[in-house]
Amino acid sequence: MRRIDSCFAELRANGRKALIPFITAGDPSLEATVPVMHALVRAGADVIELGVPFSDPMADGPTIQRSSERALGRGAGLAYVLEAVHEFRREDATTPVVLMGYLNPIEIHGTRRFAEAAVAAGVDGVLLVDLPPEEAGETRAIFTEVGLALIALASPTTSEQRLDMLCSTAQGYLYYVSFAGVTGASNLLDTHAASDRLRQLRQRAGAPVVAGFGIKDAASAAAMAVDADGVVVGSALVAALADAGEVRSARERAEAFLAPLRQALDQK
């Protein structure tokens, strides 16, 4: 959690926006995950969101669903994800890593056991898509005890009552879903409507607010970042990596995809 806080504090001090790429652990290959993470950092990533493959990713669109299926087919379970973070930490002790996934694998593992293992591996935060904030108290308490941030999600359809709860309990950063839909549906992105909401959230939240869903390139990243503390790019990056046959190709594609987004954010 401290790495996330330090990262955003430094960005804020320098007037910069956070660039947060999402990749699925184990895709395009088991061997590529850690090299791609390092490549993303070289290209300008401030935080890395690492997707935990799951068999029923209900909030994800076809691109990430297929990516998750491919990763699961290679054996990329929770143990693999934690080992990948551990390996990443051998060379990178500063870039925050946030796991993004669903509650079921965590519950099977045991929440406390998972939290302790995640921190030991070098994970800084966890975003559980299907954990309602009203039911998150016990999980948050365990995570806080071990130093793990529970990242919350808000969307255009989130009620005011729930927003109050999310803003008052936000840890690490608050992830604002720019539209009510699944990941990758960029045709639904309305930057004007999202900007209004982002301005409101940043005034209310006790943590930085980042925007995701529908961001696919430098232009959409720059537009969304105007009123956010950072942006998350996922489906477009996952698609760019999908058929990278070798680790070298995956590294090169990751850097080539992300570098223009970093440049666009730094021009704002």
From Swiss-Prot:
Keywords: Amino-acid biosynthesis, Aromatic amino acid biosynthesis, Lyase, Tryptophan biosynthesis. Its EC number is 4.2.1.20. Pathway: Amino-acid biosynthesis; L-tryptophan biosynthesis; L-tryptophan from chorismate: step 5/5. The active site is at 49 (proton acceptor), 60 (proton acceptor). GO terms for cellular component: cytosol. Coiled coil: none annotated. It catalyses: (1S,2R)-1-C-(indol-3-yl)glycerol 3-phosphate + L-serine = D-glyceraldehyde 3-phosphate + L-tryptophan + H2O. GO terms for molecular function: tryptophan synthase activity. The keyword Lyase applies. InterPro entries: Aldolase_TIM, RibuloseP-bd_barrel, Trp_synthase_alpha_AS, Trp_synthase_suA. The keyword Lyase applies. Belongs to the TrpA family. The alpha subunit is responsible for the aldol cleavage of indoleglycerol phosphate to indole and glyceraldehyde 3-phosphate. Tetramer of two alpha and two beta chains. This is Tryptophan synthase alpha chain. It comes from Xanthomonas euvesicatoria pv. vesicatoria (strain 85-10).
